[in-house]
Amino acid sequence: MSATRRPTDQSLAVLVIDDDLDARHIYSEYLRSKGLIVFNAADGRTGLNKINELRPDVIMLDLAMPRVDGWTVLKNVRESSVTADIPVVVVSAVTEVRDQTYYAGCDAYLAKPCPPEVLYLQIRALLRCQAEAARNEASL
């Protein structure tokens, strides 16, 4: 489900991986209200399974989760040739590790509490950059 194959927000899929039920609900409902297709996972293990099954266009990822943490999810996403190109937005209350998340391969970091509209705007910006990069690569 590459962003370059999808012309509108109505066909873009986001996977929200967060163990906080309230955060998952708030982010998911807002993103749905903007026309995005939203899938949810309450922990990293479930998130990894859904990433491989669904191939979302964007992943929203919390770091501190049970079973498999966000760091492990991010590492797995970046190491797989199938998922390495999926943009990952880390949304976490662990603000002192922001720089480390970029070194680990995230595309954007937002500190909790993060307004859902900011998450949406960040997702849109990442998808625009990805689409532009694909257009530039195709024109070479």
Predicted stretch roles:
Residues 25-33:
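Charged docking surfaces used in two-component/phosphorelay signaling
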Residues 35-42, 50:
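Short hydrophobic/Thr-rich beta-strand motif most characteristic of the beta2 strand and flanking loop
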Residues 54-60:
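Active-site beta3 strand of CheY-like receiver
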Residues 65:
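Receiver (REC) domain active-site loop signature in two-component systems and cognate sites
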Residues 89-91:
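Hydrophobic/aromatic residues positioned on beta-strands within the core alpha/beta folds
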Residues 114-125:
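C-terminal output helix
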Residues 124-140:
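The C-terminal output helix
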